[in-house]
Structure formats: structure tokens, C-alpha cells
Amino acid sequence: MSRRDDRSDNLICSFCGKSQEEVKKLIAGPTVYICDECIELCNDIIAEESKLEEAMGPDVKKLPKPQEIKEVLDEYVIGQNQAKKVLAVAVYNHYKRIEAMAKPGEVEMQKSNILLLGPTGSGKTLLAQTLARILKVPFAMADATNLTEAGYVGEDVENIILNLLQAADYDVERAQKGIIYIDEIDKIARKSDSPSITRDVSGEGVQQALLKIIEGTVASVPPKGGRKHPQQEFLKVDTTNILFVCGGAFAGLENIIQQRIGVKTLGFGADVKKKIEKKAGELLIGVTPEDLLKFGFIPEFVGRLPVLASLTELDEEAMVQILKEPKNALVKQYQKLFEMEHVKLKFTDGSLVAIAKEALKRRTGARGLRSILENAMLDIMYEIPSQVMVKEVVISEDVIYNKEKPIIVYESVAESA
């Protein structure tokens, strides 16, 4: 036991030697004592080491294997198994490449950026976000429709790097091993598959500008964003090891694929149209780089996105699963909100099917589920915090269709006693 020799009754910290009168707290262990100041110092040391580990990027020895990555993706994203496999392998190989490139004399490996093709609300953004969370790397998103090449009104392409830098708390080393997701990438395709002699500010010009940062360059980023000017100081960010994931719906690409594989349509009947629509998602699975060239992408841009993953349109069953099964499922989120009011929230099976059908009707995919639920739940979420003795709230199919109000079950007098 730690005591001062001259004052045997006075306990001291076993690490710094200060007495209990000199510190705020002295915590006892089986044979030692530690003061609050030493605890704080230990926490600072651990925090600094954690920051250093994060800056170095994912350790390949600790990097989850492709199967493990897919298992975590399964917890958050319903279906899309083939796309998950493609992403898991691509991301695993990307960070192994970074480790290999750090060693002198290794074979030079090209970066495997990813292109996700699939309808709105099929899970493209969520997949990219979840990957970054699994790997504990900075993540940033950008909308390709807002981008223009340098010198034109709009957002500079290099501002994407600034977003990643902000996500990394301006730690350049961490940012250089992050993931950037660029949505609506199909919107920057040029209007025809032949080169244009006029300036295409939001199409081919943006592709050319993105090409530089995607393939790897040292970008000069204004620390506060906005446009560059000569008197400004810049942060230098090397994009060589940043993984770029681009996504888009690619409406009309299925027609290009149909022409290539020789699928012909007959007449204009409703049955034929329905059949073609059903096949559209399946056709995207067979997309080739040549199809993307015809869609309006320049060869260099397609070449920098070698990994292609197609997502299919979600059906009613998948929508219902999305509502209740993932770790962050909407139903679980609303139930937690009501639980904080000491109220049990129950959704009938019919209500979940009704929500799924409404989302399919709106053609907004999984991202439309929340707005449907918010609309149906608004009144009851407004009323419940002010009510007393509410035990349970039941949401039925008719509540979703605004035909009736939720069922409220109150506690009996005996239960509350």
C-alpha cells in the first residue's frame, strides 16, 4: 500500500507520488492507488495513439475479410447480394494495395474505383456510407449535378476533397485514405457519344475535371472552401489512395444494352411494356464499359472506374424487410422514440405492406419510406408527449392510408396503482 514514510496514515498516488490532499480524487486498487491527474494523463496518451492509428489508415492485418465486410453490410442493407460481394472484394483489395504501395520495390497496382448502377432508393449511398463506417475511415458525399469545371458558376470539383478533409477534422493523412461517394454521376454524361466541339460545362468538362482527382493527383484545396484566388493559402491533398465510389440511376442505359444483345420489343402493348420494365434492372447487371461509352462517358473516365456493381429495384417484400430488419430500421427508430415516452409502439403487418406499396407507387425506393412514415405518424407524435397513462399505440394499414387514427391503449387504474 502506498503511504508516505513520514505520515503513515496519508495515502499517495502510486504513479506520481502526490498525496490525497494534493489531488481531487484518489482511486484505490488491490495494492495501488491512482489519482485523477494520472488518469487524465493516461486518457490523453491513449487518445493520441488512437489518432495516430486512424491517420495510418486501416491495418491490413486487422482489415475485415471480404466475407466479414459483406456480413456487416447485410446488417444495414437488405438484398443486393451481388453488389455487396463486388464492393467487399474491391474495398478489401484497395486497402491491401495501399499497404503494398508503402513498401519499396513492390509491383505497382492500379486503384480500383467503383461505379454503382441502380434505381433511386436501391441502397447505393447507404452501401458506401456503411463501408466507410466498417473501415473507420473519413467519408464524404457529393452531388455530380452541382459540379462544374473550374472557372464556371457552380461547385469546383476540388471542393469534394475539402468535404472529405472536413470529415477528417482537417487531418490530411486520414483524409488521404478516405472514401468519397459521388451521386448522380450519370447526369454528367455528354448528350451524345461523339466528342463535342463546344464547351460542355456540366458534362464532358466535369468528367475531365473529375478524372484528375479520381486517378490520383495532389489537389490544392482552399481551407475554407469556395473559389480559389492567388493570395490564398492552400492545403495539399494527395488523392492517389482515396477510394472513389460513383453512383447513378442511369435511366436509358438498359436500351443501349438491349440494342447490343439484340433484345427486340414487339408493339406497344401494356403487357410488353410491363415485361420490358421488369427486365430493365436485370439488363444493368450485364453492363459493359462499351455501353457506358455510348451512354456519354469519355473513355478515360470509364477506365478509372473499373469495378462495376449493379443494384436491382427493390420489390414489396424487400421494402417490408428494410422497414423492420436492419440495425437502424425505421420501425426500430420510431419504437425507440416512443419507448423514451414510456409507450410501446406496434406496427401491424398490414401497415408495413401499405408503407411498402406507397413507396413503390411513388418510385422513390427505400428513401421514400421515411416521408411516408413521418406523414402517418405526425399527429400521434404531436399528441403522445402531452398524454398520460398511455400504454401502447398501434399503427394499422388504415392509419397509413389516412382512413383512421392510431389505436391508443391506456393503462388501467389497477396497473398504474
UniProtKB/Swiss-Prot annotation:
Listed binding positions for ATP are: 119-126
Give the GO cellular component terms, alphabetically.
HslUV protease complex
Q: Which InterPro entries match?
A: AAA+_ATPase, ATP-dep_Clp_protease_ClpX, ATPase_AAA_core, Clp_ATPase_C, Clp_protease_ATP-bd_su_ClpX, ClpX_bact, P-loop_NTPase, Znf_CppX_C4
Q: Where would I find the ClpX-type ZB domain in this sequence?
A: 1-54
Per the UniProt entry, what is one GO biological process? cell division
Supply the Gene3D superfamilies for this chain.
1.10.8.60, ClpX chaperone, C4-type zinc finger domain (6.20.220.10), P-loop containing nucleotide triphosphate hydrolases (3.40.50.300)
Source domain of life:
Bacteria
What Pfam families does UniProt report for this protein, alphabetically?
Answer: AAA_2 (PF07724), ClpB_D2-small (PF10431), zf-C4_ClpX (PF06689)
Q: Which residues bind Zn(2+)?
A: 13, 16, 35, 38
Keywords, ordered alphabetically = ATP-binding, Chaperone, Metal-binding, Nucleotide-binding, Zinc
Signal sequence span per UniProt? none
UniProt-recorded Gene Ontology molecular function terms: ATP binding; ATP hydrolysis activity; ATP-dependent protein folding chaperone; protein dimerization activity; unfolded protein binding; zinc ion binding
Family membership noted in the UniProt record = Belongs to the ClpX chaperone family.
HAMAP family, per this entry? ClpX (MF_00175)
Function, as annotated, reads:
ATP-dependent specificity component of the Clp protease. It directs the protease to specific substrates. Can perform chaperone functions in the absence of ClpP.
Its protein name is: ATP-dependent Clp protease ATP-binding subunit ClpX
- Supply the source organism for this entry: Geotalea uraniireducens (strain Rf4) (Geobacter uraniireducens)
Lineage start: Bacteria, Pseudomonadati, Thermodesulfobacteriota, Desulfuromonadia, Geobacterales
Which gene name belongs to this protein? clpX
